[in-house]
Each structure stands twice: as C-alpha cells, then as structure tokens.
Amino acid sequence: MLRIAVDCMGGDYAPLEIVRGCILAAKELGYKIYLVGDKEQIIPILEKAKEHNNSLLEVVHAPDKVEMHEPPSNVLKKKNSSLYVAGMLVRKGEADGLVSAGNTGAVLAVGKFIVGAEEEVERPSIGVALPNPKGKTVLIDVGANVDCKPKHLVQFAVIGHTYAEEILGIKNPRVGILSIGEEEGKGNELVKETYPLLKATKLNFKGNAEGRDIYAGTFDVIVCDGFVGNVILKASESLGLAVVQMIKEEIKRSILAKLGALLLMPALNRFKKKADFAEYGGIPLLGAKKPVIITHGRANAKAIKNAVRVAGEFLNTDFNKKLVYNLKTLIPEGVKV
C-alpha cells in the first residue's frame, strides 16, 4: 500500500480543503494518508465527516506551520512545522511521497535538503506538462532554479526527456531550448552557451524553441531557467482564466449567443477542464529521491486528491531509475562540467 504524507497546514484553504482532499484520496485511491498538521484543527474535520476511525487516515501532529510570506529557509529551522515533519516522514521511509499546497520555496527546500536529490541530479527541477493540440509539451524548469548555468539546463533537458518518455509515453521526445529566435546564435548568453552543449548530447535536440512553440506541439520538451519558466506558467494560468471569463461575458450579450453556447457546452467544458489546475493536481519536483508534489496555493479538495494521485503515478513507474541511467548515458563526459 502506498503511503503519502500531506502537509495539511499549507495553502489558502488549509486545513479544511486539504483534509477533505485527503479523505477523497483515501476513498478513491486506497492509499494510506498521513495528515500532517495541528491535530486540534484536523481531528474535528475528520469527526464531522465521520472519517476519524478510517484506518487509511492517520493524523501526525505538527503544531507549527510555514507561512506563505516566510523565507523558504525557515522550514529547515521550524522542525515542528507540518511541512518539515511531512518531509521527515519521507526521509525516514515512513511515507513514500509528499504533497503540499504551502510555501513553494519551502516545499522546494524540503525536497532538496530533507527528502534529498537522486544520484547524479545536481539540481532538482520542476517540470509541467502543458496542453497542446497534439498532446502535451513539458516545460522545464518552472520555478525551482531561477539562476542557472548551462550545465544545469543540460540536466533539465535530460530530466524533461525522461519525464516525457516515462510519464507521458512520448518516444524519442523532441527537445528545444527556449529563445527569442529559432536560428542558432539567437538568445541571451545562457541560451547561446547551452545550445552547443545540448547539441553534443544524445538527446533528440531540435534547436531553439520560440514562445509560440510552447502550445503548438512542435517540441515535446522545452528547456529554460526557472525564472522564465515561472513567468510563463503564471501568465498561462492567468490567460486561461481570462479566456474562460471573456467567453462567459460574450455569451451573455445575446439570445443567439446563449443558444450557441448550449450547443458548444460539451466542448467548452472540455476546454475548461484542460485549464483547471485542480484536474492536474500538482507538479512534481523532478530529481528528488521520492515524489514531492507541489500543488497550487488555492488548492481545493479535488486538487489535493489529484496531487496524491500524481504522487502515486510516479511511485508506480521506474522514473528515478531511468533518470539516473539517462543522466549517465545521454550526456557525454565532456559536457559534464
């Protein structure tokens, strides 16, 4: 049975929605869930839901929490915080993975320094599978590493390649580096220095990717530093919500529009589902020894349940084993600088 530690005190709607998500995960997935946080707040929620005797739900008391505004490094000092305690459960082998909607920087710190990085991984990174008309495009890194060297981007490319193959089922994924033009030689110094290193790898490197390629499906993996990636991710999320809202406003303008909307409703609902972060659950910190799933600060019960599902999906693959192998074999010795 898979065991997942959930930080119940992290997120805008903690602990209520987090605990509800844990209940859903236990019911629908059958995993053992450790609800880590203040038992005085968690137990009443379980009792109200009549789930306090559920053997799949175990409360682990952690009276403190890491606030959203706190420096990420504080989590390593706050040893009674829900996030730290959850990380230690994974480190000790008492839990198989971690889910948190809390302070993203603090979750990254726990992933890197408590759960730890896998062999050969210099910097764990965050990869997100963005929808395109043909399937998914992996954008990596989207926030774990804002300042990078060329060697880090090369590792991100291999990590993204492995994610695309092992998790998304894309064979021989096409890899690109995000730049301001498709021609070799375009981009800032980081991109220009990384380009020849990526060419020297055994990856299916296709050159520079432009912003328009992210959602076009012309690349399967697009590499960038975490600063650029995070801006893209948040802008994309905002755009998706704005498009949905604009469509709603236009529908209200006339009877014909409302009638047309009824016919389009199935398609609109599918689009909305693709744009809904709750459906995706969370994004993994790739390269950590065990799954560390970062979910949205506004995560509701559905998002938490799906984040637990994502952790389980990783545990049911050989992702880390294949990642270590790929880092050893796809990057020539001369590129490992």
UniProtKB/Swiss-Prot annotation:
Catalytic activity: a fatty acyl-[ACP] + phosphate = an acyl phosphate + holo-[ACP]
Catalytic EC class: transferase
GO molecular function, one term: phosphate:acyl-[acyl carrier protein] acyltransferase activity
A Pfam family it matches: FA_synthesis
Intracellular or extracellular location(s): Cytoplasm
UniProt keyword Lipid biosynthesis present: yes
Pathway membership: Lipid metabolism; phospholipid metabolism
Domain of life: Bacteria
Main location: cytoplasm
Keyword Lipid metabolism: yes
Enzyme Commission number: 2.3.1.274
Family matches, as SUPFAM superfamilies: Isocitrate/Isopropylmalate dehydrogenase-like (SSF53659)
Keyword annotations of the record: Cytoplasm, Lipid biosynthesis, Lipid metabolism, Phospholipid biosynthesis, Phospholipid metabolism, Transferase
Gene Ontology CC terms: cytoplasm
BP GO terms, sorted: fatty acid biosynthetic process; phospholipid biosynthetic process
PANTHER family: FATTY ACID/PHOSPHOLIPID SYNTHESIS PROTEIN PLSX (PTHR30100), PHOSPHATE ACYLTRANSFERASE (PTHR30100:SF1)
Family as reported in the entry's similarity comment: Belongs to the PlsX family.
Assembly notes: Homodimer. Probably interacts with PlsY.
Function: Catalyzes the reversible formation of acyl-phosphate (acyl-PO(4)) from acyl-[acyl-carrier-protein] (acyl-ACP). This enzyme utilizes acyl-ACP as fatty acyl donor, but not acyl-CoA.
Name of the protein this chain belongs to: Phosphate acyltransferase
Species this protein is from: Aquifex aeolicus (strain VF5)
Gene from which this protein is expressed: plsX
